[in-house]
Each structure stands twice: as C-alpha cells, then as structure tokens.
Amino acid sequence: MAKHLFTSESVSEGHPDKIADQISDAVLDAILAQDPKARVACETYVKTGMVLVGGEVTTSAWVDIEEITRKTVREIGYTHSDMGFDADSCAVLNAIGKQSPDINQGVDRADPAEQGAGDQGLMFGYANNETDVLMPAPITYAHALVKRQSEVRKNGTLPWLRPDAKSQVTFAYDDGKIVGIDAVVLSTQHRDDVSQADLIEGVMETIIKPVLPAQWLNKDTKFFINPTGRFVIGGPVGDCGLTGRKIIVDTYGGMARHGGGAFSGKDPSKVDRSAAYAARYVAKNIVAAGLADRCEIQVSYAIGVAEPTSISIETFGTGKVSEDLLIKLVRQHFELRPYGLTAMLDLARPIYQATAAYGHFGRNEFPWEATDKAEILRADAGL
C-alpha cells in the first residue's frame, strides 16, 4: 500500500445534532429503567428556543419528557439565554405516539429467543490494531480532542469556551502504518470577549498538545484553530439539530463501511443499533485474538426473522486464517439473533445516553468492547 492520508471528524456534546442524539437516548434510558422490554424509537429536533421530541413508543412506563429534555440540555451546558439556547426557557414539544401493531406482530414471539428483527437492514462492525482500543486512530483522536474541549470548558480551565465544537484529524500512512499527523482542525464556540490570539494559544496548549501523541506531530503538521476567525453563534441558534445525523462520527470515522442506520433513540430490538454493537464485539474479538490486523464484518436481517440473512467478513489481506473459518467461528461463539445478542451484551438496560456523544465504539465502559471471546477464538482457530 502506498503512502496516503486519511481523515476523520468528531463533534462535541454541544453540537446541535449531538444534543438531539443525547435527548433521544436520555428518553430511551428513562423508559428502559422502568420497562426493559419497552419498544422505543425516539427522534429529536432542536432549533433556537425549542426542542421537538417525537417517535413511537410501546411501554408500561411513564416518563417526564419535558424534564428529561431540560436536564439533558442543562448538563450539556446550555444554561443561559445569552448562548441563544437555555435549558430552562426553551419550549419542549412532545409528539410521541405508539409503535405500529404491524411491527409488534413481526417482532414479538411466544418464545423470546425467536424474537424477530425489528426491521430489515445491514450493519457493519470493524476493528483494527492501530490503537490500544482496537479502533482507527483518526476517529479515536478526533473524539479525544472534542472530549478534552468539554472537560476544560466544564472545569473552568478555559472559561470562555462554549458547548459547540468540531474536530478533524488527518493521519499520514505508509504501507498501512501510521507515520504521523498531517493536519488538525479544531473549531470551538467561544464567548465574544476572547481574542483570537488567546483562543489559539489556549486551544493549542490546553486541548491539542495534551491529547495528540508528540511522536506523530512534526514541523510540517498543519493546525487550523477556528479558521474562520470567529465562532460566537453556535449550537441550535447556528444550526438545527436532528437525531441520527452523525452516523460516521458515531462509528469508525469513515474507515469502515456503514449500513446507514442511526443508533440513538432506538431500543435493542432495533438491529440498526444492537446488531451494529454485536458486530463491533465480533470484529474486536477477532483482532484481539490475533486472527487479523483489520476486520470488518457485515450482518443483515429481514424484519420479523430471527436469524441473520447473511454474515460476511473481510480482513483486507491481514487475516491469519481463512475468512470462511472466521465466519464458522463467529457462528459458533457469538449469538447474532436479536434476542440472543441483547442477552449476550446485556443491552436491555439504561446505558445509552453515555453513547450519544464522543463515539459508540472504542470506549471500554461499554459491554460490546469486551474481548472475553479472544482466547477461545484463538484456540479454536488453531493458533
């Protein structure tokens, strides 16, 4: 493989689309806390002065949508009208209805193990050995930058920061191996009274340098910090936000393929979410077992059918065993039916709001990041 560049981006928790994702998942968590068997599809729209929460829910639980919404916005940091968006004064509109009985009859079964998929679709999981969390480096460090922005904003280190921010990191590769960072972009919302010089110095010294490994930076690395020169108007005032619009940020930063389905606001019966988590679990364990340096798995489903309609694996020439053997091992050691994968990863519980900012993958607090199958996969592969 020749020399090449690869870029991934991330956005902060205060980005309008991420506000929407977090509200949708906060509603989901509140419902699952009372009713683990609930069916939830919650979508959120945010714009200046308002939040619209809609979707379809089937549950025995009652939750206070308005209070959940305000609490989520408050925790993100939109707490004053001078930001253009205030958790305590924004309007909250509730347009949630019931899930279609046509979907219910396709999903629910007398035998829970035969629960059908909540929809058709294809999902991908991916892992590689570029980082210690077995994720691509560009998305890993793009997330780390905006996570650091949030930390220094909230702890007062840089008090002039505001919640909305974006990052982008370009890595240079030679023969598939990282040789450095070519470019870094970080744009952050800020108070009107901070100078561009102070902002650039603060971001470089407090956010960028502590996050990016020094061995990957050199005299030719390009830095673009608030390149427009001003980012005072941000959040829902600057752009409207919608649930599910940051699917590449949420996954692998473009280094793996994507089936198109978003995650936030969906309960585990929706394979868009749960099967993508299971696919990451499979791919990560294959790489952790040393069976490949890079692994991408695709699974697909038909609505109302429990068994996946297909499983395929690609190791990009890095596999230590055949891809046919890998598929056989996956079928032997992983449960990919909707009910089974929900049980395997313990997904029917309120763990989702934390996933809705800074990526769903590469964070070891989540069950689909465990590598507990690596040892048996390696043994059964004969390595």
UniProtKB/Swiss-Prot annotation:
Official protein name in the record: S-adenosylmethionine synthase
Flexible loop: annotated span: 99-109
InterPro entries on file: ADOMET_SYNTHASE_CS (IPR022631), S-AdoMet_synt_C (IPR022630), S-AdoMet_synt_central (IPR022629), S-AdoMet_synt_N (IPR022628), S-AdoMet_synthetase (IPR002133), S-AdoMet_synthetase_sfam (IPR022636)
Subunit structure, as described in the record: Homotetramer; dimer of dimers.
One Gene Ontology cellular component: cytoplasm
Reactions that this protein is recorded to catalyse: L-methionine + ATP + H2O = S-adenosyl-L-methionine + phosphate + diphosphate
Origin: domain of life: Bacteria
Species of provenance: Shewanella baltica (strain OS155 / ATCC BAA-1091)
Compartments, record wording: Cytoplasm
Binding locations of K(+): 43
